Regions:
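Topogenic membrane-insertion module of multi-pass membrane proteins
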Residues: 1-52, 241, 245-247, 251-254
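C-terminal membrane-associated helical module and adjoining short loops/tails
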Residues: 1-2, 134-254
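Short juxtamembrane and helix-loop transition motifs at transmembrane-helix boundaries
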Residues: 1-9, 33-39, 64, 68, ...
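Multi-pass membrane catalytic core of lipid/isoprenoid biosynthesis enzymes
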Residues: 13-18, 60-122
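Active-site His/Glu-centered metal-binding helix of metallohydrolases
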Residues: 23, 49, 53, 57, ...
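Alpha-helical transmembrane segments of polytopic integral membrane proteins
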Residues: 26-29, 46, 50, 84, ...
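Helix-coil boundary and interhelical linker segments in multi-pass alpha-helical membrane proteins
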Residues: 27-42, 84-109, 152-171, 220-224
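Hydrophobic, well-structured mid-protein blocks that either form specific transmembrane helices
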Residues: 109-148
Length: 254
């Protein structure tokens, strides 16, 4: 006896989350073009939430597919590659043109560098699925890089700290270039996943749950600034662990 066909509504569900994330990234670009930078940054974080949900929904409903994987990757390129680059450019990097025409080109080149590195990072991730240790990301994940970029914009775009994008243009340039290079680096970043296989493969370690509790408390106190602190600490964690491992390495005997 043949099993009943799976409902198309269930099959479409994970792709609807992906579409919602894609819409959020597209909206971020539109909002930035209209000078609504806080809304643009928030939209990218909404896209990150949708990106975290679509894969889990697909696994829970047993509706994972190659189409969904490819669609998710393309949506990520818009939401975590193009959108953060354009938001940062409109908010701050475009102001470099007031220094000189050369610096103006440096500004949009940095934005392009970020978008290109995000594309390379996503392509590398797709080719390494099932090959690398799930406990680690090789290079800063594109959602984390986008979070670093957008938390920086969000923290200062509301003018509560007394700085605007034009004043912070060189800091923004550094943040953009560093985030781009970290994505294509070989530095390992903790993925917050365990190393188990089988049904327990996606379970989150207890330490990650403890960290999440602290993070939630910080987010309640000051959302924008807390996201920036978290983004900076996570971006630094990979290089610091790399330096620690090199320092601890015992030199070989001649």
């Amino acid at each position: 006896m043949r099993p009943p066909p799976r409902s198309r509504t269930i099959y479409l569900l994970p792709n609807l989350f992906t579409t919602a994330g894609l819409f959020s990234g597209f909206y971020a670009i539109i909002a930035a073009a209209n000078g609504q930078f806080v809304q643009a940054a928030m939209a990218v974080f909404v896209a990150a939430v949708m990106d975290g949900l679509d894969g889990r929904v697909a696994r829970l409903t047993n509706t994972s597919s190659e189409f969904g994987v490819q669609y998710d990757s393309l949506a990520d390129l818009v939401s975590f590659g193009m959108a953060p680059a354009l938001v940062m450019y409109h908010w701050s990097l475009s102001a470099l043109k007031y220094d000189s025409s050369v610096m103006g080109r440096v500004g949009w080149s940095a934005a392009f560098l970020y978008a290109a590195c995000a594309a390379l990072r996503l392509a590398r991730f797709n080719t390494q699925v099932g090959v690398v240790d799930k406990r680690w990301f090789i290079g800063l994940a594109s959602p984390a890089a986008a979070g670093l970029m957008m938390s920086f914009v969000w923290a200062f775009a509301d003018d509560s700290l007394g700085f605007d994008g034009e004043q912070l243009r060189y800091v923004a340039l550094a943040v953009t270039v560093v985030a781009a290079l970290l994505m294509v680096s070989r530095i390992r970043f903790w993925s917050f996943k365990g190393g188990a296989r089988g049904p327990r493969a996606d379970r989150v370690p207890f330490l990650a749950l403890a960290i999440a509790t602290v993070v939630i408390a910080l987010l309640v106190i000051d959302l924008a600034r807390s996201l920036l602190v978290i983004g900076v600490l996570y971006a630094l964690s990979g290089p610091l662990m790399w330096l620690w491992r090199r320092w601890r390495r015992v030199p070989e005997l001649p």
